[in-house]
Amino acid sequence: AIPSRSDYSMTDEEFDKLIPVEFWREVVDTVAQRAPDTLLLAEAFWMMEGYFVRTLGMHRVYNSAFMNMLKREENAKYRETITNVLDFDPQILKRFVNFMNNPDEDTAIAQFGEGDKYFGTCAMMATLPGLPMLGHGQIEGFREKYGMEYAKAKFDEIPNGHVVYRHEQEIFPILHHRWMFSEVESFALYTLHNGYGFDEDVFAYSNGIGSERALFLFNNRDKHTRG
């Protein structure tokens, strides 16, 4: 028979007595002392990204909320996520690694399509503070899901010329200007008022450095809006 977990569990008080210091906080502090040039990159449970950088002190954290919320068009929730970070400490935005797919998920094209929704989300990833991360085969528009155990591709895919072209025309020029978007001192998030209330489906923000400024607008829903 396989013993259940409850047979070997302990109360919170017992656990805190045996392990009084948070394990990962201790790791971060130890690494800072012994290997100060080490970059600590965390994969956090969904919606715990802020905790990993605020409390545990990780240098970077994979921001799965970006992919999941924008894919599901939970735009109000993601706007709230950004707002909460800005209210607490805007510098935390710089620690997020934003992405549209990873080896555990379907490819970016499979999740976002190959049209305006994909390229709007990709442009948003390229213009938010933090680190934009493009997945394997994303620029080529590949649809095969690559697991970490893959030694080579199983599908004989060829690059999607339309997808590659739009990356070259719309995304690469933005990435060449990452210096305008990577900091948070001039980052400002706006709310669109459409005459009836706030349109939470529209992401509007500006950023820049020195005398250079950029305004980003993205309507992440298949509808018309104005404001």
What are these regions (language model features)?
Residues 1-227:
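Active-site and adjacent substrate-binding regions of carbohydrate-active enzymes
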